[in-house]
Structure formats: structure tokens, C-alpha cells
């Protein structure tokens, strides 16, 4: 059996620095439509749960990765933050009225779309200034795992009025729930 000397703290720091440079310096900025659905997103903390959208006949579940979870109301969401939103159809009765459960909330039906919203330095810079949402990019997916034909400019236009809230809907509600 051959024993190798243990790595010195200095060698470990140098290796970590080189690894960081190699993984961050070469990664090109993401563009709309390029974000994949993270395989483990359902294990992430919920940003908001069972968001009721009777106007859209939808129920939404919104997850955030741990990086986004560490955000603060005063500082916004940092680079590396990712949100995943599942949009479900609200179940409807035969007469077209929406079903509600014993709690008075809409009942989830079929999954319609999975949207991903991610933020990192330099992302979204290819977007025309009037629709740019800081460093956020968007992607839409079908329940089958195929890319959805949705135009991400629709996402951008919806989030654009929220520039003071880091372009995130229900920002205040989320941070109020953490106090």
C-alpha cells in the first residue's frame, strides 16, 4: 500500500481557486430559452405555494433554489438565483365554474407548463433594453419535458414593471412570510 502525503491547506486553496476560474470564466452567459428545468427543483424550498390565479384559471407552485432562498428584501436575489414555477390548470366543473376544495382554494388539475427564471452576471444582455429584466433569463417547458413554444418576451413584459422588486412577482409577500 502506498500512502500519498495529505494535501496542504495552501495546495487545497490553490486547487479551489483554479477550479473556480475554470468553471466560471469559460461559461458563456445564458440566453432566454436556454435554462433547463433543474432535476431536483421539487426538493427546493417553496417561494410560494398554491398561488391562486382564478383570472387565468390556474394554480401555481413556485420553488426557489437555496441561493435564491438566501436573499434579503433589501438586497434582492443574488447571482445564481433560480425560480421554477409550475402552472396547473384549475379544475372546472361541467358548468365551467372552477372547483374549490374544503379550504376554499382552487383545485389543481393538469400541469400546463414549467417556467424557469434564473439570474447571473451578464445573463439576458442580448435582450433589447426596453424588455431587459436585469440579469434574469427565462425558459418555458411542456409537461413532457419538451421546450414550450412560449415567447419569453411575454415573461419579460410581465416582470418588467417589477424593477424595484428585482423583477420578481410577490416579492413583498415572500419576504413578509419569512419574518
Role assignments for model-derived ranges:
Residues 1-11:
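Bacterial N-terminal signal peptides that target proteins for export
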Residues 24-57, 74, 78-179:
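Sequence context surrounding c-type heme c attachment/ligation sites in exported
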Residues 57-68:
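Short, structured beta-strand/loop micro-motifs enriched in basic residues and often containing a Trp
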Amino acid at each position: 500500500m502506498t500512502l500519498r502525503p495529505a494535501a496542504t491547506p495552501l495546495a487545497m486553496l490553490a486547487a479551489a481557486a483554479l477550479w473556480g476560474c475554470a468553471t466560471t470564466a469559460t461559461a458563456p452567459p445564458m440566453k432566454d430559452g436556454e435554462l433547463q428545468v433543474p432535476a431536483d427543483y421539487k426538493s427546493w424550498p417553496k417561494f410560494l405555494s398554491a398561488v391562486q390565479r382564478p383570472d387565468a384559471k390556474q394554480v401555481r407552485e413556485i420553488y426557489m433554489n437555496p441561493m435564491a432562498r438566501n436573499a434579503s428584501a433589501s438586497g434582492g436575489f443574488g447571482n445564481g438565483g433560480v425560480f421554477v414555477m409550475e402552472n396547473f390548470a384549475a379544475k372546472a366543473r361541467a358548468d365551467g365554474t372552477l372547483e374549490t376544495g374544503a379550504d376554499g382554494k382552487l383545485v389543481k388539475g393538469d400541469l400546463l407548463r414549467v417556467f424557469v427564471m434564473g439570474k447571473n452576471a451578464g445573463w439576458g444582455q442580448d435582450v433589447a433594453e426596453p424588455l431587459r429584466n436585469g440579469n434574469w433569463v427565462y425558459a418555458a417547458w411542456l409537461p413532457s419535458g419538451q421546450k414550450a413554444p412560449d415567447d419569453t418576451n411575454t415573461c419579460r413584459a410581465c416582470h418588467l414593471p417589477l424593477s424595484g422588486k428585482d423583477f420578481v412577482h410577490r416579492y413583498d409577500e415572500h419576504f413578509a412570510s419569512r419574518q
